[in-house]
Amino acid sequence: NNLNMELVQTDETLLKCMEFVDLQEFKLDQNICEDGSNLSGGQVQRIGIARTIAHLKEVLLCDEITASLDAQTAIEIENRILDLKEETVLYVTHKYFDETLKKFDCILVFKQGRIVEQGSFEELMKNKGDFFSLKNKGHI
């Protein structure tokens, strides 16, 4: 019930959500301590993502959702999220990988709380503005 959080979902839906975040080894009746102490930080993060996917509506807001994950798992989950076809995905993070950056329809670049650039990966690189500078300095 930890994944479900008391909202009604079928077992099949919950299992698909666990598969989405690579936690197939978990069982729906698995004991999880209230404070998550019997899980790794990455597992806690992935359960949070699975909860979100289980109750997904039309817009998915992802705020640093892969921060506690290793690079390979983060890339896999980012790709799965970006492959969601029916939802609008707003993705907020400071840690990006080239493989996923190129999949975004539109990237907004903020500086001191204001949007200073927007466009696709290719457009932003071609404009040679703040995004280009951050990317070339290794900050993205």
PLM region spans:
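C-terminal portion of ABC ATPase nucleotide-binding domains
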Residues: 102-140
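Conserved H-loop
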Residues: 95-102
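Conserved "ABC signature" C-loop
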Residues: 1-33, 56, 130-133
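Conserved catalytic loops of ABC-family nucleotide-binding domains
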Residues: 80-95
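Helix N-cap at the start of a conserved alpha-helix in ABC-type nucleotide-binding domains
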Residues: 71-72
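Catalytic Walker B motif of ABC-type/P-loop ATPase nucleotide-binding domains
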Residues: 60-64
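Conserved ABC ATPase signature
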Residues: 31-39, 43
